[in-house]
Amino acid sequence: MKAKYVFPSDYMADPAANVFDGKLYIYPSHDYDSGECFDDDGGHFQMKDYHVLCIDGDPMEQDAKDCGKQFGIEDIPWVEKQLWDNDCVEKDGKYYLIYSAKDYTGVFHLGVAVADKPEGPFVPEADPIRGSYSIDPCVFKDDDGEIYVYFGGIWGGQLQWYKDNKMLKAEHLPEGKEDPLPSRVARMTGDVKQFAEAPRAVIIVDETGKPLPADDPHRFFEASWMHKYNGKYYFSYSTGDTHLLCYAVGDNPYGPFTYQGVILEPVVGWTTHHSIVEYKGKWYLFHHDCVPSNDTTWLRSLKVAELEYDAEGHIKTVK
């Protein structure tokens, strides 16, 4: 399953691929060299604007087209810096881009921007989503029309500072056989601008129903993604410091999700972030690596590979 670069003319990462109006749209973060030094909290990822990419043909043959800059830090009153991952969903002819960014107190929140077309232009709301925190939103529209946002990331994503949706006085990173820090999920309001409920923990369990422990190399770290296949809910994610993309399967949007296996083995570069989408009868994995930038971890390039399932619905590992 050979992968190809999607947009070789610029550094883009964290691709959220969606199909709207028969076209493939990609909502990435936009890397650039800010001059910041590498640190474990991601201070070297100083992205300052968002672009939308589009493909109307075979993504394994055609490069993506840049639909242009959508908005930047200067357009969002509550944001100081670091426009990180984003995703988009359609409802009633409107398009809602949910993104993560850091406010003037150094805390990450989720924001919403709205457009009349999937390619934009997107206009950001003046305030973040109430009760939101951390990073890496994935917006999932279920078959019944309900919309959910999955989010969360450890270390620079600040998830270790929260418990029961409240900020702690001191961070806590679970170790050993402790329960790991989970992703979060919340159903959205009808206008797709606020949480309709308090975020819940997304629990990943083994085949016996026991949660994966904090020291398991396949536990959640960041980069939540949700898709459905044959009526099942596939929750996929990055393991962060073990550099894998893994997945787990459940029977509803909230889980629990039973761990299944590895989707993508480690790539060149520290981060691994992805999306999975069906387009024109084929399934695709979008992700990124740092080969074109000679392993500069904050200068990443988008890639795509065909994704295959076996007869039992297991995803075949992309090597």
Swiss-Prot record:
Q: Which GO terms describe its biological process?
A: xylan catabolic process
Q: Name one GO molecular function term.
A: xylan 1,4-beta-xylosidase activity
Query: What Gene3D superfamilies does the record point to?
Result: Glycosyl hydrolase domain, family 43
Q: What positions constitute the catalytic site?
A: 14 (proton acceptor), 222 (proton donor)
Source species, domain of life: Bacteria
Query: What family does the entry list?
Result: Belongs to the glycosyl hydrolase 43 family.
Q: Which PANTHER family match?
A: ENDO-1,4-BETA-XYLANASE (PTHR43772), PUTATIVE (AFU_ORTHOLOGUE AFUA_2G04480)-RELATED (PTHR43772:SF2)
* Function per UniProt: Exoxylanase capable of acting on certain xylans and xylooligosaccharides.
The protein depicted here goes by the name: Beta-xylosidase
Natural source organism? Xylanibacter ruminicola
